[in-house]
Amino acid sequence: AAVLLAGGQGTRLGFDGPKGMYDIGLPSGSTLFCLISQRLVKLSQLAKASHGQDGVSMDVKIPLYIMTSPMNHDETKSYFESNQYFGLPAEDVIFFSQGVLPCLSTKGKILLEKPYQCSMAPDGNGGIYPAMEKSGVLADMVQRGILHIHTFAIDNSLVKPADPNFIGYCIQTKADCGNKVLWKSDPHEKVGVIAEKDGKPCVVEYSELSKDMAERLVLVEQEQLAFGAANICNHYYHINFLQNQVIPN
């Protein structure tokens, strides 16, 4: 299954609407939602052609779960409906909303939307885990017999949804989870990096790296940045890992 993190608005892009509806300037006018959906359609076709036997084609389904936010849920859903789900089967496109948290000022004060009402904002990509459980998405995956999950963010126009190579590698190595990274183009590139803290892998935001840490070099096969593996929000999970390790904790 593919899980798309699409709770954000296009505000920083100068666009008033869900980020996935943003036109990135292609000659086709395709939006991010359109690109990702069309790639899944093509992947389904390729998988179907590859695994048919004796002239009988195999039914291939790759469900797309889209995590929205309360701010863009209805608009996102309507956009897919009005575009006939970009060729995907409607029953295989599932929308669910992440939670919200109170907005705080830099001094830790709760901000108000209006008198007696807290200003709220989506709870970030990490909100996917409680949202999957509360919305019934995890149960739906189990009911469908899904074992392998590819999760990625909407603002990656080059993403390969349900990436066969990435998922296949994780299956081959019997990984519970995986994280695809890109190497930083510059020591001070504004991107979080994969690191190790107290013996456990973690993501460190660029704002938390000192100048010395950002520029530190280590010798592997050749000199390279010690903190150069940029996190691009591109993850693999086995369903058992989510059920038994992530959700309970």
Feature map (PLM): residue ranges:
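Domain-scale recognition of functional cores that engage charged ligands
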Residues: 1-4, 11-249
